[in-house]
Amino acid sequence: MDNPKVCLDEEVLRKGAEVVKATNARIAKAIGTNPAARTTCVKPEGTTSQLLGTSSGIHPQWDKRYIRTMTLNNDEPQLEFFKLWNAHMTEPKVGNPNATIINFPIEASPGAITRHDLTAIGFLQTVLKVQKAWVKTGCAHDDHTPGAHHNVSNTCSVRPDEWDQVEEFIWTWRRDITGVSLLPHDGDQKYIQAPYQSLTTAEDVLKWNKLKPVPVDFTQFREKTDNTMLKQTVACGGGGCEVI
């Protein structure tokens, strides 16, 4: 959504998916394994998009300027290191005395699409286009699970007068789009310390302006104890980790 003329062009998406399939097949042959049956999807990645300064996954930018929050446990050593320079960006997590919120001031890149630029149906039509041109084109074969596809994970921002249309659209295209979450368009005003917060009051603008971060040199960070919890990693579950 930060570069829609390229990233949402159907021909670009199809050609890109073909390149992914060909690359996967070439690498699979080189390392002696079977190529993937499905090679493409779209998933939101908050941390990476935060570092790159882009919107997350298929989603438009929340606003031209907004506050992005991140929750960390109080016992995480990198939090204490961060607070040495940027205590002004942190606040206690409401309802959880063992967690802290970090507030990041975000400004969308020029030309980026925001959620205010799209209707809910317009957003879902974009999801459908990417699902067909990128995700389904990236399917090399469906020999084992016919009809199953990866998906474009998404959260749709819905205005009060759009719910019926959204319901109808999702039902009509239920065989093509899945992984849809729905959020009221003003959801950031309904939830305390929401992940994305528009600047709707003078106080919000003042807060945003005060959140200017001080650069942190994390090369100086040292973790004295290993707090890794293997059960919390994505590849682990049920008390064990998958080894391939």
Where are the language model's segments positioned?
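Short acidic, low-complexity intrinsically disordered linear motifs used
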Residues: 227-244
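N-terminal hydrophobic or amphipathic segments with adjacent small-residue motifs
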Residues: 26, 40, 51, 232-233
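Solvent-exposed alpha-helices and their adjacent loops that cap or buttress functional pockets
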Residues: 31-34, 41-43, 147-148, 174, ...
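Internal maturation/activation junctions in enzymes
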Residues: 1-43
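Catalytic alpha/beta core of large soluble enzyme barrels
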Residues: 44, 51-230
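Conserved phosphate/anionic-ligand binding catalytic regions in large, soluble enzymes, centered on
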Residues: 1-2, 35-64, 240-243
